[in-house]
Every structure is written in C-alpha cells, then in structure tokens.
C-alpha cells in the first residue's frame, strides 16, 4: 500500500465537535490547510454528499463522531448495538465493570442463528469471529473530511479524526463485510465482537475470554479475524510485551550535606543505564533475545520521576519501562531484567523492579489466504487477550488485518482514505470466504 500523502496527513481543517463529554483537540494553527485558494469546487457539502451516499462511510462517520476514550465507551457501544439490531443481528451486551453497565462488549450474530447459541452445543454457534475495539486513546479529535484541490477522485478523500484508523475503521469495515457476506450466504456462521478497553490493558477482551457462555469449551470459533491498522496487509505476527517499573528508595537531606542522605536518583541510574541497552546486548551477555522474524527486542524508558527540588537529596525515584519482545517468553524476559538490575546495582536492595502487567510473548498469526501483502508489526493488540479453548479438530486460525497505518493511529493527524476503508471491506470478505471454504472442505 502506498503511504498517505504527507500533505494530506498534516491537514486539520476546523470542524464542529459533537456534544460528547471529552473536550476535543483543536486543530493546530500552523498546520497548512488543503487547497484553500482553489477549493471552491470541492465544498464541504460536496464532501458530505460523498459520505451520505455510502452506508459504509456514513456509519464510519457517525461512529467516529462519538467520543469513546477508554473508560467512556458507552455511547459508542449503544450506537453499534442499535445499528446491528436494526440489521437483523441478535446483540448481547456483556458488562465489563461491576460498578455500572455503562461499559460493555458487544457480541452479535444473525438473528436467524439465534437458536444455535447453546453452551451445550458450542459447535452450532458462530464459528467465524470478526473482532475489534471501540475505545480510543485521548484526546478526542472531531471527524473531518479533506481533499486536495487538484484531485477529483472521491476515493482519495481523507477522513480524519480520533479513531478513524484505530480502530473504528476496522469496526466499520468488518460490519459491512459481514452484511455483504450474509446477503448472499445467509447461513454463514458469523459472529461480531467489539470490545472496550483495548488501549488500556484489554479488560474488555479478557472479560469475554472469561465468559463460559460467550466463550465455551470447546471453542465454537475455528477462525478469528482481528481488526487493527495494518495498511491492508495480513500480519504474520507481532512482538510481545512486558511492562515494569524500576523504583529506588533513599533518604532526603539538604543538598549542601548530601552525605547525610541517600540519593534515590543516584541509586537508580546504573539500573536504568543497563536496562536501556538490554535489547542491544547479546543473550549470552545477559541481554534480551532477538529473532529473524521480529528483529531486535526494543526497550523504551518512557517515564521518569524523582525528587522534589534541586537542592534536596531525592528520597524516591522511579521509571516506567515498556519492552517489545522479539523472542522468548515474558517470564524469561522478567528474569533477564531482574538479573540486569541486580548486576548493575551490585545487589542494592534500595532498587526494586515491579512488574505491572502480566505480559506476553510474540504472537504468531496466520497468513495462508492468498492475495494479501504480508508483514509483521511492533505494536500490541488484543490477540493475546482472547483466550479460546481448544477445539477437537485442531487449532484456531487467527488473522490480523485492517485499514490505515499505525504510524498515525495515536497522533493528531490520524486519518485514512475512502479507498482504504472500502478496500478493507473487500479484504475482510476475502478472509471470511476463505474461512467458509475451509469449514466446508
């Protein structure tokens, strides 16, 4: 897939924000506007007409226009649920938090197959699952449309706003791929799962995995198609993840008399210097492993804090670290990190490592459907959070595919083109058909 035009990606024309709880991010004043001098033939009305004429683009617009930052997904979930119910789907809203019913996953399947959702006969339910997430990262950025003044091709219209790419583009394309498939193959055993909380640890997908009703044993699904921005390529796998905090504890004192205290920052620095280079150190020398498929393991010290003032010996210091694992297990990586910190500090018990999340190793995925480019990615997904039970007939096929590029997914230039969204529908239909063919062969 060709990269998006850098000019188009930097555009952010003013658009009125819908009345949602989070404050929208204002367009940056110094970002150039597209075709200001010659844009009269491409009025906002003409751009809106293109979207209004397409059920796919209209649904995507309406979904993106609803703020759904992680923790506040209720309105977006209700919109998706209502849409699916109006298109003859049975919709189950699975609560994710016990405090309220405002956060829920959406599990849906054709009403004509409702009788088959039976725990005692899981093989009779939906067998092909399309799944993505409806939450986004902050801040909310309003939906907007942009077009180069010299481009008359509607397919090149740029659709911008928070979630256009990650991952409401996948949600929209998956829904319309399912609708198109069911229109010509009504018995197709399709299920749709749209979860909350993917951006903040995956509590939505974990809740689905733990449901014996929705996720019975043995698994009813023989194929799962995950939706994330992959530039319309099939992903052969993505790196694993390990998150942790390095913390040091000291004793405060006046900076004029530092020997009366113990500097937590001085204690933590050798540990961080060692951790920062673990991805570049050979395994036999105590480093983190690499692989031919995923390259090097990467380490990012993304947060640091410590001390209260420059003239006070700091009593506390801490740093947050994210590791993208190219090989091995997260348990093995933990041991490597712990040993590195011990070696760097000489076993100083004032410096400790706290592992915040469970973590996971590299995730290998299927790419056995012809007609797609194949790639690997470095970002994390809900793939490891979906824990399916074994099937008597073998392993579950897992695919990762979707429109847009991760390079803009969390930025203020998040956007994709009409062509990418429409092509994603065709791509998902191809993956669905391959799964249907497999189940009947």
UniProtKB/Swiss-Prot annotation:
Pfam families: M20_dimer, Peptidase_M20. Its EC number is 3.4.17.-. Binds 2 Zn(2+) ions per subunit. PROSITE patterns: ARGE_DAPE_CPG2_1 (PS00758), ARGE_DAPE_CPG2_2 (PS00759). GO terms for cellular component: extracellular region. GO terms for molecular function: metal ion binding; peptidase activity. Glycans are attached at residues 88, 150, 354, 373. Residues 1-16 form the signal peptide. It is found in: Secreted. Its cofactor is Zn(2+). Gene3D superfamilies: 3.30.70.360, Zn peptidases. GO terms for biological process: proteolysis. Keywords: Glycoprotein, Hydrolase, Metal-binding, Protease, Secreted, Signal, Zinc. The active site is at 198 (proton acceptor). Zn(2+) 1 binds at residues 166, 199. Zn(2+) 2 binds at residue 166. SUPFAM superfamilies: Bacterial exopeptidase dimerisation domain, Zn-dependent exopeptidases. The keyword Hydrolase applies. Belongs to the peptidase M20A family. This is Probable carboxypeptidase NFIA_052450.
